[in-house]
Amino acid sequence: YLLEELHKEGHTPEAIQEALRAMPMHPAMIRGVRSLQSHHHGTDFLLLSNSNEVYIHTILPSKGLAEPPLFTEIVTNPAHWEPNGLLRLRRRISPDGPQHACKVGCSANMCKGDELDAFKQRHADRKYERIVYVGDGGNDFCPVKRLGPNDVAFVRRNRGLARRILQEGGVQCTVRYWTGAWEAEQLLNLLCPPSP
């Protein structure tokens, strides 16, 4: 795999983490979620990613998204550094345990729809009025299909999720399309305007 190749080539954990920290994240996306957090204190944020813990816990602080804490929960694949410097990834759903029964096309390691449902169940006392889901990959189709009529999906144009919605349909929620992060920021501000 790629991580094993990087390790064989002598790339250190520090070099990999530095590359992760250098990855760009548009300031408008950061402003959009921070504005939502500061003006709507009852908002919960779930980071639902098919990435891994090491990547996420390296990137978030470098973009100012770790403190004050933004995410109520982060659901992703476990990962850790081996003593020899190899980044070891594990599947969120172990290949040795019970598997998900998703028929929408989620990857074997995680059904994002099941994970979203489990999050809502864990926080059932919150009685969410609306879920706003921001996604772009084809693996975001399953949770978007589970959203209801009061929910909104912010879908990045010309990506896997937009293609699946167009080709397969079956979505009950409102879909708002965006291309650049500034559009996502505008949509967030329109949907949840900052309090005066």
Language model segments and positions:
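A metal-dependent, Asp-based hydrolase signature
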Residues: 1-44
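C-terminal cap/substrate-recognition subdomain and adjoining C-terminal extension
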Residues: 30-34, 38-46, 51-196
